[in-house]
């Protein structure tokens, strides 16, 4: 029996290795320093932060942890001259800001060669607002496949709004549309293939599946919600769920993680765990003053 189990594990390990070798880096991660393993302390590509406020209160969110600890970045541009890509934004919900259209236009003029990415929970995106925005990539967060589960995770009854946002961006083929999903085993692992199927049916181009980072202030909330902390750190579990979602959509996992996994052999992939705990999230890029005046 022991030999049979070992053979089965080796077969699964080889399948995981093949899957990893074939995976592409998320479109959003392209140009990020994390893809270059020769960089000792890589940072995320630049972002423009509009507000740390959010109309969701997600049980896993790093942004609300930063707010509680007084470490959320102040509004402004965090990056450098000649960026390849800029995200609006990494903290808070950018569509809450009345300056979203103004800043979007300013960044397009100020950095005409840069790719502009919008990261949003989608709940405030309407057809009217969408017509005023100009982005190359839109990432919409969705971590549940039902209204009830979505409300439990986000503490907001906005599931239908988020689905509508996916429909809006999925229909616009001038942008790369991405559903951004956090892997929370015990909470949403069964939802992830359903999210992938739903997003694909709405014309969304890609799923960016990310491993959970457990921030200390969120531990109790995640525990009450049913998180399996051990499985949350298992690369094997993450990859198995990604393989299931791949049946429906172009699924990709975090680029800085993927480049490391591609260097591992099959059995290492099968057995490795990722330490997923962190006390406080920090922006590692310096704030740079740029003008935001409209012509």
Residue locations for each model-derived region?
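N-terminal [4Fe-4S]-dependent radical SAM core
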Residues: 1-54, 59, 63-69, 259, ...
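Alpha-helix-loop-beta-strand connector modules within alpha/beta enzyme cores
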Residues: 100-111, 163-172, 229-253
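Core AdoMet radical
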Residues: 45, 62-73, 80-97, 103, ...
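Alpha-helix N-cap and loop-to-helix initiation/capping positions
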Residues: 153-160, 187, 223-234
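Acidic (Asp/Glu)-rich catalytic clusters
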Residues: 78-81, 130-134, 167-172, 200-201
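Auxiliary Fe-S-binding modules of radical SAM enzymes
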Residues: 1-8, 193-194, 198-295
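Conserved strand-turn element in the central/C-terminal portion of the radical SAM core barrel
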Residues: 166-191, 195, 211-214
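Distinct, well-ordered alpha-helical segments
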Residues: 100-102, 126-133, 191-195
């Amino acid at each position: 029996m022991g030999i049979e189990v070992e053979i089965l594990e080796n077969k699964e390990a080889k399948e995981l290795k093949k899957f990893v070798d074939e995976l592409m880096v998320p479109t959003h991660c392209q140009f990020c320093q994390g893809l270059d393993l020769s960089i000792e302390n890589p940072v995320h590509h630049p972002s423009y932060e509009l507000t740390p406020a959010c109309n969701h209160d997600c049980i896993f969110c790093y942004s609300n942890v930063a707010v509680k600890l007084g470490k959320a970045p102040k509004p402004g541009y965090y990056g450098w001259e000649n960026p390849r890509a800029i995200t609006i934004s990494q903290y808070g919900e950018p569509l809450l800001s009345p300056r979203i259209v103004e800043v979007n236009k300013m960044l397009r003029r100020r950095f005409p060669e840069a790719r502009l990415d919008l990261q949003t929970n989608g709940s405030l995106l309407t057809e009217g607002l969408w017509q005023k925005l100009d982005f190359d990539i839109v990432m919409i967060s969705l971590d549940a496949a039902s209204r009830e589960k979505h409300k439990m995770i986000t503490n907001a009854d906005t599931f239908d709004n988020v689905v509508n946002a996916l429909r809006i961006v999925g229909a616009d083929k001038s942008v790369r549309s991405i559903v951004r999903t956090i892997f929370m085993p015990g909470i949403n692992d069964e939802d992830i293939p359903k999210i992938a199927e739903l997003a694909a049916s709405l014309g969304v181009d890609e799923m960016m599946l990310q491993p959970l980072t457990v921030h200390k202030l969120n531990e109790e909330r995640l525990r009450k919600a049913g998180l399996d902390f051990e499985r949350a750190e298992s690369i094997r579990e993450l990859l198995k769920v990604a393989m299931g979602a791949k049946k429906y959509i172009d699924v990709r996992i975090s680029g800085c993680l993927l480049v490391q996994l591609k260097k591992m052999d099959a059995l290492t992939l099968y057995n490795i765990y990722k330490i997923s705990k962190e006390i406080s999230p920090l922006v590692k890029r310096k704030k740079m003053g740029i003008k935001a005046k409209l012509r």
